[in-house]
Design a protein with these regions (language model features):
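Extracellular adhesion/carbohydrate-binding repeat motifs centered on closely spaced tryptophans
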Residues: 1-187
C-alpha cells in the first residue's frame, strides 16, 4: 500500500477493489469473504459478490450456495431430480461434455437419448453417464463408440466381430470365421 504496509484482504487501489491473501499476494477467481463469495477476474478486478442461499447468477455463470457454502467440484441433485455439476470455481457446467456426461445449456445432466452435432448418444437415466460399448435399450441392442460415445450407424469390426447397425442404430453381430467366410446372425 502507499503507507508501506502489506496489503491484506479487500483493498481499494485507484478506485478498484482487489483482494490480497495474508502474504500480500493478489488473488483471482472466486474468493470467500466476510460478505459472501466475491469474484475477481484475472487482472484482480472485483466483478461482484454472491451471498444468498440457492442459485446465484454472476457475469452469466450460475453458482449454488448451500448451508452457507458454495458448491465446488461436486454434483448436486435438486428435489425434482435434475443433476448439476460445479467446477473448482463453483461455476455450474453447461452446454458441454465433461467426464462422460452431457450438460445442457440449462446446466442439468442430460439423460436418455441425446442428439448433438449430428450424432446420437445415450446417457444412463440413473447415473447420467454416457454409455459406451454394447447396450440393450428398450429391448434393442446398440453399440456406442468407446472413445467418442457416438451410436454406431453402419459397420465396424470390434474384437474380431463385424458389427452392423442399421439407420436407427439397431445392431446385428456377425462373427468372422476366417478370411472370406462369415457366420451371420449369431455370435
Amino acid at each position: 500500500t502507499a503507507s508501506g504496509k502489506l496489503a491484506v484482504g479487500d483493498v481499494m487501489i485507484n478506485g478498484t477493489c482487489y483482494h490480497f491473501d495474508s502474504n500480500g499476494i493478489m488473488k483471482t477467481g472466486m474468493i470467500k469473504t466476510e460478505n459472501g463469495y466475491t469474484l475477481y477476474d484475472l487482472d484482480g478486478y472485483q466483478q461482484g459478490t454472491i451471498n444468498k442461499e440457492g442459485w446465484n447468477l454472476l457475469n452469466g455463470d450460475y453458482y449454488y450456495i448451500k448451508d452457507g457454502e458454495m458448491l465446488t467440484d461436486t454434483d448436486f441433485q435438486t428435489s425434482d431430480g435434475a443433476r448439476y455439476t460445479f467446477d473448482s470455481q463453483g461455476i455450474m457446467r453447461k452446454n458441454e461434455q465433461f467426464e462422460g456426461r452431457w450438460y445442457s445449456e440449462g446446466g442439468w445432466c442430460m439423460v436418455g437419448w441425446i442428439f448433438k452435432a449430428g450424432s446420437w448418444y445415450y446417457a444412463d437415466p440413473v447415473t447420467a453417464q454416457i454409455c459406451t460399448g454394447f447396450q440393450v435399450i428398450n429391448g434393442v441392442q446398440y453399440y456406442f463408440d468407446e472413445s467418442d460415445y457416438t451410436m454406431l450407424i453402419g459397420d465396424k469390426i470390434v474384437d474380431g466381430k463385424l458389427i452392423i447397425a442399421d439407420e436407427n442404430g439397431s445392431v446385428t453381430i456377425t462373427t468372422i470365421l476366417s478370411e472370406g467366410w462369415s457366420c451371420y446372425g449369431g455370435e
